[in-house]
Amino acid sequence: MKRFPVFIATVMMVSAMQAADKLDLKAITSGEFAASYVTGINPIDGTDLYASISNDGKQVISYSFKTGKQMSILFDVNAVKAPFEQIEGYVISPDGKKLLIMTHREAIYRRSFKAEYFVYDIAKKSLKKLSQGVNQQVATWSPDSRHIAFVKDNNLFVTDGDKETQITRDGKFNEVINGIPDWVYEEEFSFNRAFAWNADGTAIGWIRFDESHVKTYSLQMFEGSHPTHSEYHDYPGEYSYKYPKAGQDNSKVSLWSYDMKNGKTVALDVPVDSDGYYPRIKTSPDANSLIVYTMNRHQDDMRLYAVNPFTGKSKMLIKESVPKFVKEEVIENSIVGKKNILLPSDRDGFMHLYLYDMNGKLLRQVEKGNYDVTSIYGMDEKTGDVYFQAAKLNAHDRQVYVAHKNGKVERLTDAAGSNSAYFSGDYRYFVNTWSSYSHPYVFTVRSNKGKLIKTLEDNKQLLEKTRKYNWGKRETFSFTTSEGVKLDGWMVKPVDFDASKKYPVILFQYSGPGNQQVLDSWSTGSMGNGGAFDYYLAQEGFIIACVDGRGTGGRGAEFEKSTYLRLGDLESKDQVETALYMGSLPYVDKDNIGIWGWSYGGFNTLMSMSEGRPVFKAGVAVAPPTCYRFYDSVYTERYMRTPKENEEGYKVNPIERVKQQHGALLICHGLADDNVHPQNTFEYAEALVQADKDFKTLWYTNRNHGISGGNTRNHLLRQIANWFKQNLK
């Protein structure tokens, strides 16, 4: 009897606190829950130092790996009276005497951008603009620090700081590109620079893209706002660019080099199929060669060649051929060192590392086991130690490891969650970035034995803020589907969760090939930032759950490649199975389960709502592909081959099974989406109309695949939240 009033008072106090600190979408989308970072980390070659950009973006500062202490200010915006207010990036010259500083960055596509570049002489404290006229792209030091190469208006240039030389002259928008990739190469092979210096800076090689025969896609543009396009004040306009779709013509690619001494251009002869790819060109330790990667159109055969930039002759070094497809990460994570090539491969069923010499001879498999290597940091060629990240403990965890020459593998990080690293040039130290479901990013300096030297940033204030707002716990779970497949997931419950009640559930998923959303990281969650949007929805009375189905990453090649040739089939079955599992839990209202996702997650939302088992009462698809005939050639054919080769596989799509669509459906799309075109939603909307299905669409003026700018993201998330509030309660 005496305890009862105390209990009531406690509940009232907690309720008052929760009411006072209620999550707000405006706060979430304005960056209030954004983490702090240590930005622009660059190890300084030949030293035990690294550099980074100051928090205010006005300085480049060097620090000691050994002590963690600040050593010197390499550049200061105010001290040199720079004609810009902030640094947006920088590259230290190989000799350490100059900085190439980037500012006024202007995004083009996902990875590409134009910027205004300046060269800063550290000793002389002099600042000079790299080039006059329009802004440049991918400015890059030569290995001897004497020249900088860059691209301007689709042409390749070099400068020594005084004299600027134009190497190519045929570059033209929507026709010819030199030294930077076309749209599909950039998006699907994950790079934005298509040139490389040779080892001593006496030659430069590049990929030339002839996209004149690639079909054009046009996006309608309006005046809009944030930013405003005044040129479309009275009449809308168009942005037209080359976009090869599945089975259609790609750019015709060729390789060229320029001799810095005699000014001659040489055609490089590297064998590739007429419809194949050159997905990378890299510097080799030998000045008489460059390393070129080739890939056939099916993307199941990748080769590395050494090509002489002066004669154009080449020889094959390595051939990588695996069932179904070579993952894009094999190209992205491979490293050409001074004496060796490190190549990741899933040839034995899991992604592991293989060491080759510069003649292409396989020396050894670096490590083994039933786990995937997820990133490579490099090799200390003095000791033979190889440093990498792997999902060795489980599919949802990332740790940093070293594999010794004798085959012994040691773990260098100890905190469960997601760990990554920036190593010093001599591999004696590294900057460790760690986070987990419940803890924002922590940046520390460590020795190559894993010993903590200094904490650079711990995001303590953000952590305290999440506690102030009563963010709940992200609980993990597993279950087995009716097909005998074990799937893993997480869920977020309301803070005042009562197991005797029944709650509506919202499933969030991406489900795309190789992707993971069930990952013990602060980046996990439907909109990043520690999953702030998930906690907002939980605050509104929902349970939020996420499950990685078949085709996702971290569990080996068999699991990841199981969706080959039939994208959306198994993925949608697994989300339906997730809904059935959630519905079996005593605290879940099985009649009020929704699903949503963005991009591939939007595609799989539509597929799941038309899978045939009507388990979803509502769903939201953001920027969804609706038929892979509409999507780009490289991505789609990697997993599906061409429509001509796989007609039945391409029929597995939301449009084909629109009559089975079940549940209240909201589709959101940006009208300027250069990645997943609005065409996808337009065509699906027409199919829904003809099938006599009710639905709602939201269009965002001038917004690309990210759907942001001004108040846009706040508006979008409010529509998603309101849709589920209206239809699941």
What are these regions (language model features)?
Residues 65-68, 121-125, 160-163, 259-263, ...:
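Short loop/turn segments that connect beta-strands within beta-propeller blades
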Residues 215, 287, 420-729:
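Serine-hydrolase catalytic core recognition
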Residues 36-41, 85-91, 180-200, 280-281, ...:
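Signature of short aromatic-glycine-proline-rich micro-motifs recurring in repeat-based ectodomains
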Residues 38-42, 52-62, 72-74, 88-91, ...:
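Non-catalytic accessory segments flanking enzyme active sites
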Residues 69-96, 106, 132-137, 321-324, ...:
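Blade-loop segments of beta-propeller domains
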Residues 51-57, 64, 92, 99-111, ...:
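Beta-strand C-termini and the immediately following turn/loop, strongest in propeller blades
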Residues 111-158, 163-194:
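Asp-box/WD-like beta-propeller blade repeats and closely related beta-sheet repeat scaffolds
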Residues 25, 31, 68, 104-109, ...:
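Predominantly five- to eight-bladed beta-propeller fold
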